[in-house]
């Protein structure tokens, strides 16, 4: 069978990107266009000749547009096998004309349910019925019908029609049909996941089933190590579609590596704890913070963060919660850093920083999603959990010692707690006046993490005396707390919950420490 010339097209899109220009070109090629609702209105207002779908069906759109394309004259025109005499005869007998092209994208269900204030009724109204039905009919009959779901394919389809006497090639129609079934399967899975979530609302159990699709965005030179192959993928699940380019723009430098991506995730995850607050700087190495500080100016915050550990930042990643200014950029330029991440770059800063070709400069365009599922792959299955996005406020703190913390201690404890959440367990973090003094990360023993944090402070020449200490989990024994007291800390923030809490509290009282419980643990593996 030769490639069928496209004579009649059915167009009905929610995302109207590029649709006017596309249909204008179709019309110029002599294609007869039929459309519905808002799409029809936009086409006609743009001077494009298009007829209502009702001229095919002989039936009006009803029930607020819920029923408009579910009709035998539509689906018969799509599904008829063109070289089947019985199909052709039945089509003629029933006044059915063939439809050669379907251009449809679906109601934005995933985007709708991703909104924090979406109602159940709003979600239900964004379940597309007619769209998937037309897409599936057209895709099934891809031998004869061209089906387009993505505006990114408009130019390709038009170019092919121009070079192929108004027809698309068989290979193209098959590729477009495959995209349809990928789209509709994901769409249905998103609806099912939402309804499962609605049914389980208020329950603490994970969903009974989750559909996850990974779409490769780029190949990477290698993975965590040179002998490992790797790629970066767009994640599509019941909570929507998300990828690096949705949140960031790489403005300068080499391609991002596997490890770069991990570090960017760690850096932005922590710096967003300070979104909307005074200038804050986060310095990351191997996904752990080696220096974090907050100050009245960005350059002061950077200098404080850098002074926590003046060796580890070399080759590290630095993230800022406010636009990067020239004074801070010049200070940062004194050392080699892999990546800088900022919500904006002030005039002249990019030009200055781009003089070092190997430095990557990243713009964070919008906040990361917080209420999304987190996936961790193992060799024997997938672990799924809510992101650790819950925030502890001052009102949540429970003072468990005789001495109450003063305002500065409270400020430093809250600051330290934000950081401890983002450090590999076991975690001990010392903070003083809005600056990390020492960070102990990833040790099998909490007391060892405390020792490392203390030694890092000593190496940097920073005084722990009067600092606040945060522990990501409870102190199982008093030894960790006593180590902090011996180092000079005066306040402690920890989850509590140990069977030896009374012993730990007594040790705090004996050493005149102010201690608060958060009742929330922040293990990070």
Curated annotation (Swiss-Prot):
EC numbers for this chain: 2.1.2.3, 3.5.4.10
GO molecular function, one term: IMP cyclohydrolase activity
Pathway participation: Purine metabolism; IMP biosynthesis via de novo pathway; 5-formamido-1-(5-phospho-D-ribosyl)imidazole-4-carboxamide from 5-amino-1-(5-phospho-D-ribosyl)imidazole-4-carboxamide (10-formyl THF route): step 1/1; Purine metabolism; IMP biosynthesis via de novo pathway; IMP from 5-formamido-1-(5-phospho-D-ribosyl)imidazole-4-carboxamide: step 1/1
GO cellular component, one term: cytosol
Name of the molecule in the record: Bifunctional purine biosynthesis protein PurH
Domain of life of the native organism: Bacteria
InterPro entries per record: AICAR_Tfase_dup_dom_sf (IPR024051), Cytidine_deaminase-like (IPR016193), MGS-like_dom (IPR011607), MGS-like_dom_sf (IPR036914), PurH-like (IPR002695)
Presence of keyword tRNA-binding: no
CDD domains: IMPCH
Family to which this protein belongs: Belongs to the PurH family.
HAMAP family reported for this sequence: PurH
NCBIfam families attached to this UniProt entry: PRK00881.1 (NF002049), purH (TIGR00355)
UniProt keyword annotations, A-Z: Hydrolase, Multifunctional enzyme, Purine biosynthesis, Transferase
Native organism: Prosthecochloris aestuarii (strain DSM 271 / SK 413)
One GO term (biological process): 'de novo' IMP biosynthetic process
Domain MGS-like intervals: 1-149
Gene: purH
Entry text on domains: The IMP cyclohydrolase activity resides in the N-terminal region.
UniProt key word Transferase: yes
Catalysis: reaction(s): (6R)-10-formyltetrahydrofolate + 5-amino-1-(5-phospho-beta-D-ribosyl)imidazole-4-carboxamide = 5-formamido-1-(5-phospho-D-ribosyl)imidazole-4-carboxamide + (6S)-5,6,7,8-tetrahydrofolate; IMP + H2O = 5-formamido-1-(5-phospho-D-ribosyl)imidazole-4-carboxamide
């Amino acid at each position: 069978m030769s490639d069928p010339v496209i004579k009649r097209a059915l167009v009905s899109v929610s995302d109207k990107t590029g649709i006017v220009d596309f249909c204008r070109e179709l019309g110029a090629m002599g294609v007869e266009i039929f459309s519905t609702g808002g799409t029809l209105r936009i086409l006609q207002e743009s001077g494009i000749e298009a007829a209502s779908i009702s001229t095919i069906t002989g039936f009006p759109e009803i029930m607020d547009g819920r029923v408009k394309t579910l009709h035998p004259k539509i689906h018969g025109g799509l599904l008829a096998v063109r070289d089947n005499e019985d199909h052709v005869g039945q089509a003629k007998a029933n006044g059915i004309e063939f439809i050669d092209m379907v251009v449809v994208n679906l109601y934005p269900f995933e985007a709708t349910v991703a909104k924090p204030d979406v109602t159940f009724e709003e979600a239900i109204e964004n379940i597309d019925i007619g769209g998937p039905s037309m897409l599936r009919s057209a895709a099934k009959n891809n031998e004869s019908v061209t089906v387009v779901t993505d505006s990114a394919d408009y130019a390709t389809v038009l170019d092919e029609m121009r070079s192929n006497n108004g027809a698309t090639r068989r290979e193209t129609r098959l590729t477009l049909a495959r995209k349809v079934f990928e789209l509709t399967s994901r769409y249905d899975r998103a609806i099912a996941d939402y309804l499962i979530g609605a049914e389980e609302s208020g329950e603490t159990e994970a969903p009974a089933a989750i559909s996850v699709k990974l779409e490769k965005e780029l190949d990477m030179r290698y993975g965590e190590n040179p002998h490992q192959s790797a790629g970066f993928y767009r994640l599509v699940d019941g909570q929507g579609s998300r990828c690096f380019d949705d949140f960031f723009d790489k403005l300068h430098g080499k391609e991002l590596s596997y490890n770069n991506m991990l570090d960017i995730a760690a850096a932005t995850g922590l710096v967003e704890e300070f979104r909307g607050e005074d200038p804050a700087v986060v310095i990351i190495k191997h996904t752990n913070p080696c220096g974090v500080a907050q100050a009245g100016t960005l350059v002061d915050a950077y200098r404080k963060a850098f002074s926590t550990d003046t060796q580890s930042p070399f080759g590290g990643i630095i993230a800022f919660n406010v636009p990067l200014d020239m004074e801070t950029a010049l200070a940062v330029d004194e050392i080699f850093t892999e990546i800088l991440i900022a919500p904006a770059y002030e005039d002249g800063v990019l030009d200055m920083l781009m003089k070092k070709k190997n430095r990557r400069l990243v713009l964070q365009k919008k906040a990361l999603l917080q209420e999304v599922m987190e996936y961790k792959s193992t060799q024997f299955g997938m672990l799924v959990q809510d992101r650790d996005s819950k925030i502890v406020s001052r009102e949540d703190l429970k003072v468990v010692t005789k001495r109450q913390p003063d305002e500065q201690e409270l400020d430093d404890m809250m600051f330290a707690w934000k950081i401890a959440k983002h450090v590999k367990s076991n975690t001990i973090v010392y903070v003083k006046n809005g600056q990390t003094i020492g960070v102990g990360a990833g040790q099998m023993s909490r007391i060892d993490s405390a020792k490392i944090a203390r030694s890092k402070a000593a190496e940097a020449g920073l005084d722990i005396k009067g600092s606040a200490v945060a522990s990501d989990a409870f102190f199982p024994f008093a030894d960790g707390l006593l180590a902090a007291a011996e180092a000079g800390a005066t306040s402690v923030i920890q989850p509590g919950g140990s069977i030896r809490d009374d012993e730990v509290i007594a040790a705090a009282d004996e050493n005149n420490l102010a201690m608060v419980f958060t009742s929330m643990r922040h293990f990070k593996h």
